[in-house]
Each structure stands twice: as structure tokens, then as C-alpha cells.
Amino acid sequence: MAIPKHSLSPVPWEEDSFLQVKVEEEEEASLSQGGESSHDHIAHSEAARLRFRHFRYEEASGPHEALAHLRALCCQWLQPEAHSKEQILELLVLEQFLGALPPEIQAWVGAQSPKSGEEAAVLVEDLTQVLDKRGWDPGAEPTEASCKQSDLGESEPSNVTETLMGGVSLGPAFVKACEPEGSSERSGLSGEIWTKSVTQQIHFKKTSGPYKDVPTDQRGRESGASRNSSSAWPNLTSQEKPPSEDKFDLVDAYGTEPPYTYSGKRSSKCRECRKMFQSASALEAHQKTHSRKTPYACSECGKAFSRSTHLAQHQVVHTGAKPHECKECGKAFSRVTHLTQHQRIHTGEKPYKCGECGKTFSRSTHLTQHQRVHTGERPYECDACGKAFSQSTHLTQHQRIHTGEKPYKCDACGRAFSDCSALIRHLRIHSGEKPYQCKVCPKAFAQSSSLIEHQRIHTGEKPYKCSDCGKAFSRSSALMVHLRIHITVLQ
């Protein structure tokens, strides 16, 4: 059921809602004292924007004074001495983006005080996902029947806001839920700004609606039970008054708790593990790890993902696109992270260092695998025989012993192998390649293990020792031949 538009509080980005914003001289005095908090800075920036946008030609004595006054107001808002061109551009884009939103969404997003267009877009995405689940149609207009006073009923004034957007209310009860804890200084939805040093008197063009005769200090400054009391709304009919908090519950409207809770530091807490996050999108992505929700499905293969960005990365597998190219060698990659990892081959950068032995690695995954050498951790266990491994690739190769799978085949002779490295070593037989060179003599080998055995000739090392007679050997194969002597004697 839709509702009349007048049940929504006007917001700063509705140009037809505001006539004038007056800010008392205490603002300059308080700002000169320095040490603005983040909340005070946002309030000051919004007040400056409103003064600039609602300046009237009649306030100046002439065109030159009007132009100079506008220029000064613009500088107070955009602060070119403190902001770069990109930051100023971001402010302008953010304002235009908020102004282009549907009024219902615009009111809620504006209350969150987004600092950038990207942050505002994330907030819109979060809200629309919740509303989509409720079956809300942003293009639907309120019907005449839904707006009739007789349909609402005098005994149920909470129906005015309770039915907005398929049951998700953006009315006064939602305002209270969006406020910082312990704060009655700021109305979370109406867009009005309250600071200790700034007093704003806001007058609206609209001549109808629930707030037309309500003083500003009664709309946003009440706290506790007095916020929605009858004395706070003396000029409203019973149908226009905001719903009492005991008749409306935000949890009931959503069906669950709200997606995240607004606070002064914009931090959110996971209900499952109590972990804190700085943004709504980060919290929602984290919560999907508990519920294992994967709403983003690939139309090609049906694989589902918890984030739309992960789906976009996956779809490159089907398209074969590799837009990220290395400027050094021309090799292309489907993901920018893969390009970054590849570029470390050219730069020699190894930013990941082991705290135990100091060894460095170019990839974080390589460091994680290496650290298991120190911890002895072997998290990957074979279901067939129980043997455990420190790396998943080693487990995969081992499992082929049980399955008999040999997916790597030599094109020259047709011989098949269970792992890729074995095929590479085999291919050197056909190519004659011997990449492992002895530093003492000019002899070269096709396999690194053969080079290690050869180097023992120069070093004299004999690590393989017979437990029966104590004789030592440089190769394990030589020890096996020697052991047969003892076996023959015993027989």
C-alpha cells in the first residue's frame, strides 16, 4: 500500500522544499576556536551548501555585490584552498546524484551523510536490495484509495508510515533508529543539521503536509518519549501525527533487524560474531559468510557469488577478455591483481616477509604456504588414506594415486603423468634441454634432483647411511643396491 508523499520529511536536496536557511553568527565564533569534529565538519559543510544554493538576489544591494556574495558562499562550501579539483568535482557530482534519486530513497541516503558519490551509490544499492526483497516498485504512485483518511482509520495512525515501500518505514520511528546512540541533537531522516554552535531555522515552501506549522525545535530536538508525544505535534490531526514508537518496530518492518545501524562513526557490528565494520557494504558482504548467501549467479555456468564484483571477475573466464597488459613484456591478464603479481617478476619486489626466518615472497599465498614449514600445519587431508599435506595442490596430486588419473599427456610419445611438473621434466628428454648447470664443472642436467646428486661429487657429501654396517652413499639409489647385499647374506 502506498502512502501520501507528505508523510516523508523534506530533505535538503529537494529544491522546492526549502525557502530559506538562517544560520546565526555563533557559527563563525565556534569555528574560529578550531578542532572541528567529523560530525561538526559535515554539519558545517551542509549548512554552507544550503546558504549557497538558496541565496537570493534580493539579499544584495546590486549585481556586483550579489556576485561577490555568491562567490564567497561557494568558497565556504567547496573550500578550494583545502580541496583539490578532484575533491571539488566529487562534491558536485555527489550533490547532483543525491538530487536525482527518488524522494523516498533520497531522504534515507541523505541522512547517512555520504562523503563521496561512491559511498552514496553503495548506500543506495544496500537499501534497494532490502526494498527489492519487500517487492517495492520505485515507479509506483500512491493510489487515491491508499491516501483516503477513511482507509487509514483513526485508531491506526501508524499506517501512514508503516506501509511505505512494502512495509519498510522511513517515518519518525526509522529516524530514531538511525540516530547515533545517546544523541537527540540530530534528526536522522529529515536532513536538518543540529550542532552545538549552529542554530538553523528552516522554512518550507510547502503549504500542506504534516510539518507545515510545526516549529523546527519541535521536529528534531525532542528526546525519549517526548519525541512523538501529542504535545510535540500540536497542529496535526490524528492521521497526520507520526506513529507512536510502541506501535511501530523497525525489526517488524524489515522482517529481520535492519541491514546496519547508523552511528556517529559510521561503524556497524555483525550480529553473529560481533565484528565491527566501517561501512554497510563491508558488513553485508561479511554477513553473507555466515548465511552463505550467493545472490549473484553467472548466466553462463550457474556459479553463484556473494558479491557482484566477484561475478564480474568470474565472467571474464567465459568472455576470455584480458584487459590488463604488462608494459614490460606485453603479457595480458584478466584481473588487475594478477597483473600486479606478475609485475613483481620484473621489479623483483617481494613484499611478504616471514617473521620466523626472514624469507620474502612476491605473493601472500606463497608466504602462507611457507609458514606451514615452521608451524608443521597440514590442513589438507586425504579422505582415502588419511595422509595430510601443507598445500592443496599436493593433496590434489596425491589423490590421483588413488584415482589413477593422469591428465597431463606428452604429445610426442603419448605418455601420461599425474602432475604437470612430471610432464615438464619428461618433455626435456625429447627437447634435450638441460637447464640445471653445475657451477664447479661444465656439466648440465635436465632435472634439479640430478644436479643436487652430482654436486655431492664435488662436496663429498654422503647423506644416505646403511644402518647395518654404517657405510654411507651420495645417492639413495646406491644405498638401495647396497642393502641387497645384507638381504642376500641373511637368506
UniProtKB/Swiss-Prot annotation:
Taxonomy, superkingdom: Eukaryota
Subcellular location: Nucleus
InterPro entries noted in UniProt: SCAN_dom, SCAN_sf, Znf_C2H2_sf, Znf_C2H2_type
Keyword vocabulary terms for this entry: DNA-binding, Isopeptide bond, Metal-binding, Nucleus, Phosphoprotein, Repeat, Transcription, Transcription regulation, Ubl conjugation, Zinc, Zinc-finger
Start and end residues, zinc fingers (C2H2-type): 268-290, 296-318, 324-346, 352-374, 380-402, 408-430, 436-458, 464-486
Tagged with keyword Protein transport: no
Official protein name in the record: Zinc finger and SCAN domain-containing protein 22
UniProt organism field: Homo sapiens (Human)
Gene expressing this chain: ZSCAN22
